[in-house]
């Protein structure tokens, strides 16, 4: 009888300030998209686990909301708590920074990381966007002095550059353990949650600078239909009447584009036909009300 093959499994937190490319890195590490991305900061509002199983190795990545100093609204406070609490009980932290930029928010993150017992890997993202390459090496030396990093790796998550190096380091730091999830799992989140995230991503991509932080999505219906697909009803909540008009657009043009793009992404993710209907409703003050936020699925606890 052959010896049982050893398996390795571990949790890896991906942290950093808003808009440094954490979700793009997660998607690249997984080889497919599960965490929404946009060029706007704070696209990620929830912690999302991405699961990558390859042979005996299962890496469970935790993509976190961006840590930031500003906590003016209840939603910002919850997002900060969600990101901070992800740092407990992980085997490794990947700290993502952006090119040659270093901000007060980066400083705040590194201050939190210094007290951790687990190793911290520094990923310098978007190095392909650094126009003056002579600044890169001195900046890497500056970053190396901030704390005792396990390693410092320059990457481009968007282009996949050196992401395999990150994955290799992750595998080396995984403890011997049974896998937590079946090998075909790519996330711990439900299809209903992923549907709401896909709609929110399209809202952020197609609407103006201000609106996305006053908008959230609630899935009111997610049911299989007789054709082997899904009927999905999404409720888009905004804070003001003017925002509702912005989401709907002239003669419904904007919400039609958002709905079409979201449906196509859902069909790719769920590998089934989707019938999607969207509504827009005004619910003033939702982003300042912790009780309302929790009812909409915003929480600082892992689900």
From Swiss-Prot:
InterPro entries: G_ERA_dom, GTP-bd, GTPase_Era-like, KH_dom-like_a/b, KH_dom_type_2, KH_sf_prok-type, P-loop_NTPase, Small_GTP-bd
Superkingdom of this protein's organism: Bacteria
Cellular component, GO annotation: cytosol; plasma membrane
Topological category with respect to the lipid bilayer: Peripheral membrane protein
CDD domains the record matches: Era, KH-II_Era
Molecular function, one GO term: small ribosomal subunit rRNA binding
Start and end residues of each stretch annotated as G4: 125-128
One of the GO BP terms on file: ribosomal small subunit assembly
Region (G2): 42-46
Region span, G3: 63-66
Stretches assigned to the KH type-2 domain: 207-284
Location of region: G1: 16-23
Task of the protein: An essential GTPase that binds both GDP and GTP, with rapid nucleotide exchange. Plays a role in 16S rRNA processing and 30S ribosomal subunit biogenesis and possibly also in cell cycle regulation and energy metabolism.
Protein name: GTPase Era
Name of the gene this protein is made from: era
């Amino acid at each position: 009888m052959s010896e049982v093959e050893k398996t390795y499994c571990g949790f890896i937190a991906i942290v950093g300030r808003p808009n440094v490319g954490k979700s793009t890195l997660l998607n690249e590490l997984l080889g497919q998209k599960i965490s929404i991305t946009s060029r706007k900061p704070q696209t990620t509002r929830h912690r999302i686990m991405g699961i990558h199983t390859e042979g005996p190795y299962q890496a469970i990545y935790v993509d976190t909301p961006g840590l930031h100093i500003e906590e003016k609204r209840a939603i910002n406070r919850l997002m900060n708590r969600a990101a901070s609490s992800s740092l407990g009980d992980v085997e490794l932290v990947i700290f993502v920074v952006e090119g040659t930029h270093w901000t007060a928010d980066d400083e705040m993150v590194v201050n939190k990381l210094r007290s951790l017992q687990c190793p911290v890997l520094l990923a310098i993202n978007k190095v392909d966007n650094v126009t003056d390459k002579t600044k890169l090496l001195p900046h890497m030396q500056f970053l190396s002095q901030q704390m005792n990093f396990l390693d410092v790796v320059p990457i481009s998550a968007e282009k996949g550059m050196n992401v395999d190096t990150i994955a290799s380091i992750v595998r080396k730091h995984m403890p011997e353990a049974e896998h937590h999830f079946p090998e075909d799992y790519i996330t711990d989140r439900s299809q209903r949650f992923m549907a709401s995230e896909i709609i929110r991503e399209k809202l952020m991509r197609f609407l103006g600078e201000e609106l996305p932080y006053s908008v959230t999505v609630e899935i009111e219906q997610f049911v299989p239909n007789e054709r082997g697909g899904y009927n999905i009803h999404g409720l888009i909540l905004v804070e003001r009447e003017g925002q509702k008009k912005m989401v709907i657009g002239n003669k419904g043009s904007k919400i039609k584009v958002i709905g079409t793009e979201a449906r196509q992404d859902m069909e790719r993710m769920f590998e089934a036909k989707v019938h999607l209907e969207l509504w827009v409703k005004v619910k003033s003050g939702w982003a300042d009300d912790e009780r309302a936020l929790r009812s909409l699925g915003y929480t600082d606890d892992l689900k």
